[in-house]
A protein has these predicted regions:
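Short acidic, Gly/Pro-enriched loop/turn segments at secondary-structure junctions
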Residues: 1-6
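Polybasic (Lys/Arg-rich)
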Residues: 8-106
């Protein structure tokens, strides 16, 4: 079966990465001033929006459907990023960071 570019865009273009889903959500991420200058230059998604804040941090808003690949990209920024919204994504990242920290007991 042939699939048109428009159909592909409809299914894959609104989500994040290669993972698709039914409901499109919006992630709001705040990057530290140290990471801001690098992240502001990155293209995470064709429909992303970003703004440099007065304190030097950078806020990135990005659409996603399935969080799998987005969580991986968030995690690579470690302590330089905070998930502001949605709460479900914030909790997923918090759990992953807690599990990672447990690998390094005092």
């Amino acid at each position: 079966k042939s699939v048109s570019d428009a159909q592909l865009e409809q299914v894959l273009g609104t989500g994040y990465g290669i993972f698709a889903g039914d409901k499109i959500r919006e992630a709001v991420l705040r990057f530290s001033p140290e990471a801001a200058r690098w992240v502001a230059r990155e293209k995470w998604h064709s429909r992303q929006s970003g703004r440099l804040e007065e304190d030097g941090s950078y806020t990135l808003t990005i659409p996603y459907a399935a969080e799998t690949e987005l969580v991986m990209d968030i995690m690579r920024h470690g302590a330089q990023v905070e998930v502001i919204a949605p709460d479900s994504l914030r909790e997923t990242v918090r759990q992953r960071l807690t599990a990672a920290a447990a690998q390094y007991p005092d």
